[in-house]
């Protein structure tokens, strides 16, 4: 496993991150697996040299953080791993996240967002669930239009100064919003973000327009989520019936229907499949190799419900694509509506 700096920071992270959203309770999402099924996956990830583990307080309403903390204490030393979590959404099983379908329950005051009150309460609750006295990377899950940017950045700075987080990161927002937050931090001598966790894969490349160039210019590391487009790039959907998934997640993941399956998306999967067959590797490995090789990308966040899936992702780091192969994969792309910021 190779290790690289997270953006312009001195923090060394593996070229693959294990996403912990898959681990928790099926009460939250039907495709989530419980702790016993997660145990061998986390153990294997540590054995393979993965040191970056990404979760969030809202995943399974805190259950993901609890599992993350217990399994990492079982299989790794605290000083050898990088724990990342997030704040913004309500921590309640009734709330599935900003992109989840269906009616949204009424939010109670201060149960979400990025106010000083919310951030201070959320970091303490996350640390308790994780069973640690600090997180390495504390990320804001979304931009909060209801809280002054100055208030949010000062609160995050105080979390770092209190020793409860080593670095801060952000996720899924417009480039102008992220630039504004970084500017406020710099102007006021506050802690700046070292990472951006954004929606980026072969069938969703809208981040290449503004966010990625900005991050590369400013030394912000990219930690893309959904590198396989929720399994689509691995082949979990058929063109003739995109609503009939081939995996447990595909059969129940209504968010994917909102994000993907345009006509051009299937053309990308066809190009991906042809190249994978020619190279003698899986579709997923080609998709990971393309993403890991994009300028500015530090580590794709890989979700896994089986051990072989994390092994496959790590092997993908050895797959090097030529300029001609990259062009072959990218040629069918068509613009998409901007999705993932809600």
Regions found by a protein language model. Name each.
Residues 1-82, 133:
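N-terminal binding-site loop/beta-alpha segment at the start of enzyme catalytic domains
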Residues 9-29, 84-110, 139:
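N-terminal small/glycine-rich loop or linker at the start of catalytic domains
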Residues 18, 55, 85, 137-140, ...:
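Conserved beta-strand positions
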Residues 23-36, 105-120, 146:
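Active-site mouth loops of central-metabolism enzymes
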Residues 32-45, 113-129, 178-182:
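Short, acidic/polar
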Residues 71-78, 128-131, 160, 182-191:
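Acidic (Asp/Glu)-rich catalytic clusters
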Residues 127-147:
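Active-site groove signature of glycoside hydrolases
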Residues 144-331:
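Beta/alpha (TIM)-barrel catalytic core signal, keyed to glycine-rich beta->alpha loops juxtaposed to Asp/Glu
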């Amino acid at each position: 496993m190779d290790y690289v700096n997270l953006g312009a920071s001195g923090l060394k992270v593996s070229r693959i991150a294990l996403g912990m959203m898959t681990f928790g309770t099926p009460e939250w999402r039907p495709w989530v697996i419980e702790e016993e099924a997660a145990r061998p996956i986390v153990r294997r990830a540590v054995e393979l040299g993965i040191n970056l583990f990404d979760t969030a307080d809202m995943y399974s309403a805190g259950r993901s953080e609890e599992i993350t903390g217990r399994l990492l204490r079982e299989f790794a030393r605290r000083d050898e791993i990088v724990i990342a979590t997030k704040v913004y959404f309500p921590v309640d099983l009734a709330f599935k996240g900003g992109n989840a379908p269906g009616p949204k329950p009424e939010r109670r005051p201060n149960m979400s967002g990025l106010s000083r009150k919310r951030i201070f309460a959320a970091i303490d609750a996350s640390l308790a669930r994780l069973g640690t006295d600090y997180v390495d990377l504390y990320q804001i899950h979304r931009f909060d239009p209801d809280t002054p940017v100055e208030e949010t950045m000062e609160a995050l700075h105080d979390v770092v100064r209190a020793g409860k987080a080593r670095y801060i990161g952000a996720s899924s927002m417009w480039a102008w919003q992220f630039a504004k937050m970084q500017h406020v931090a710099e102007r006021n001598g506050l802690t700046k973000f070292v990472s951006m966790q954004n929606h980026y894969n072969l069938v969703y490349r809208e981040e290449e327009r503004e966010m990625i160039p900005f991050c590369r210019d400013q030394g912000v590391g990219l930690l893309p989520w959904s590198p396989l487009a929720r399994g689509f790039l691995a082949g979990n959907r058929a063109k003739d019936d995109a609503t009939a998934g081939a995996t447990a997640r595909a059969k129940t993941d209504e968010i994917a229907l909102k994000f993907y399956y345009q006509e051009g998306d299937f053309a990308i999967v066809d190009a991906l499949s042809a190249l994978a067959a020619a190279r003698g590797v899986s579709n997923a490995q080609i998709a990971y190799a393309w993403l890991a090789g994009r300028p500015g990308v530090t580590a794709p966040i890989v979700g896994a419900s089986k051990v072989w899936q994390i092994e496959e992702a790590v092997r993908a780091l050895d797959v090097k694509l030529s300029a001609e192969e990259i062009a072959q994969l990218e040629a069918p792309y068509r613009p998409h509506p901007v999705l993932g910021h809600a």
